[in-house]
Amino acid sequence: MEVRVQNIRKEFGRFPALEDVSLDIRSGELIALLGPSGSGKTTLLRLVAGLESPTEGTIFFGDEDASKKTVQQRNIGFVFQHYALFRHMTVLDNVAFGLKVRPAKRRPSAADIRRRAVDLLELVQLSGLERRYPAQLSGGQRQRVALARAMAVEPNVLLLDEPFGALDAQVRKELRRWLREIHDRTGHTTIFVTHDQEEALELADRVVVMSKGAIEQVGTPDEIYDHPVSPFVYGFIGQSNCLDVTLANGEIWHEDRPIGLRAGNEPDGAATLYFRPHDVELIDGCGGCLAGLVTASRRVAGTRHLELDLGRKHPPVEIELPPERAASTDHTRIAFRPTRWKLFRKGGQKEAPLIEAEAPVLAATGT
């Protein structure tokens, strides 16, 4: 089922929770709404579900205007963060509940309801637990029951509101892989809300990055991570560093020295340089580079993260190096240069990047 959100505005009192939001979700797509608290992602999900009504704008399911329809009329499957299972019902009865309470004209036979519930429990790998109660299940098992219950009604759209937020890290990782497999097998149009960027990038076909009630960027995980279109997206997705720089005569300067990167034909003036900790190369000497004193070093999985003080009260930057390369750098001065970076002109969060580069394009010169 295709879902189209057109020019949606939602106000709570005088507070604009969403402002002119438009989004096309393809049939069978798994899409993530990602953003910090207060970005509007949960409000958008609730509007699609019919749990809230838009102040302005329209929501289409296929070619049909669903804006005035109830939750039941929209045929939505909803999975919440805290399961919302019926404690007094068995696993099988929880899964079958949505079918059992349908109006008589639309209700399948008891045999068909049981068959579908059993099939879904097999799909979510809970066969044999039909007679257990929620209190007898682990958190991961309860969330699987909640998903099976949502799918039992054969929903037009499946909505997941931070479904793994209450689970520990290892269980979340396992369920993410499992949910992607389930989606690929069933083909439901699925929208899920998360503040966990790793979860969004791993699971989704496309990611919708939201901030302050607006959509900042929509794209595949690769597009979002590798080609962020605004300072907000660059800073929110993954780890990043930003430096105040100056463009002068086609070169990029930090403080009082060029750093070995070209600014192309951009006019002179102030800008911000963004780069990721792993997108750097070390430089012998420092003719046209950045340099800083190592103030902290910590091991993170297969890399070592070094915190560098660039001086002049500038916020520290962080770079990542292989542990063996970083072993000799403790408390020493490191010269480096970004290998992949973006420039944004100062004064506009929405402005497109001035320059996007994947390698330094100006040889180091001078001292």
Swiss-Prot record:
GO terms for molecular function: ABC-type sulfate transporter activity; ABC-type thiosulfate transporter activity; ATP binding; ATP hydrolysis activity. It is a peripheral membrane protein. It catalyses: sulfate(out) + ATP + H2O = sulfate(in) + ADP + phosphate + H(+); thiosulfate(out) + ATP + H2O = thiosulfate(in) + ADP + phosphate + H(+). It is found in: Cell inner membrane. Keywords: ATP-binding, Cell inner membrane, Cell membrane, Membrane, Nucleotide-binding, Plasmid, Sulfate transport, Translocase, Transport. It comes from the Bacteria. InterPro entries: AAA+_ATPase (IPR003593), ABC_SmlMolc_Importer (IPR050093), ABC_transporter-like_ATP-bd (IPR003439), ABC_transporter-like_CS (IPR017871), P-loop_NTPase (IPR027417), Sulph_transpt1 (IPR005666), TOBE-like (IPR024765). GO terms for cellular component: ATP-binding cassette (ABC) transporter complex. Belongs to the ABC transporter superfamily. Sulfate/tungstate importer (TC 3.A.1.6) family. This is Sulfate/thiosulfate import ATP-binding protein CysA 2. It comes from Rhizobium meliloti (strain 1021). The lineage of its organism: Bacteria, Pseudomonadati, Pseudomonadota, Alphaproteobacteria, Hyphomicrobiales.
